[in-house]
Amino acid sequence: RMVKEQAERLGKPIVAHLNHPNFHYSFTAEQLAEVVEERFFEVYNGHPGINHLGDETRPGDEQLWDMANAIRLGKLQAAPLYGVATDDSHTYHGGNVSPGRGWIMVQAERLDANLLMEAMERGEFYSSSGVTLKEVSFRNDILELEIAGEAGVSYTTQFVGTRKGEGAVAGEEFGETKELQPVYRLRGDELYVRAVVT
């Protein structure tokens, strides 16, 4: 609420995000889902001590994301939670918390703070810890990517999401491909779908 009030007061869009939800396992998927005013959280944080992958009893950040979005979209009828990536750099001259481990790529008309924030609010961005995409589009219920492939590197794209209805598995894999131009056509029973490129 305070972020929204500040944005209105300044007449500028402001994007706030929840940092490293698994640092000390601070948040559950239910808590992430229920704060519907929060639209962004760190699905990837490059700091080595934030429990990105979870442990044997707690979900990793991507699983938290799927669980939270299943609740938001399926039960609360709320907007989805978007995932951002950051490097969380603490040092700039060596060490294991240096810059360049995670970032976002925003599809905006030009490099302008307001346009970047507005594009993020519309979900027109992707998060990365290494892969670059030439294109991302979602039209006519078709999600299409074009991976900027590097010579000698192979890529795998998994389409992950949650279906509508009781008993649906949060974070189900809907498909996988090794193509540089992966495509997913919605069947109509998905709450959401996201692409994971490795």
Where are these regions (language model features)?
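A metal-dependent hydrolase metal-coordination microenvironment
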Residues: 1-36, 44-51, 56-64, 71, ...
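C-terminal functional module detector
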Residues: 71-82, 87-198
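Short, solvent-exposed loop/turn segments at the edges of secondary structure
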Residues: 35-38, 99-101
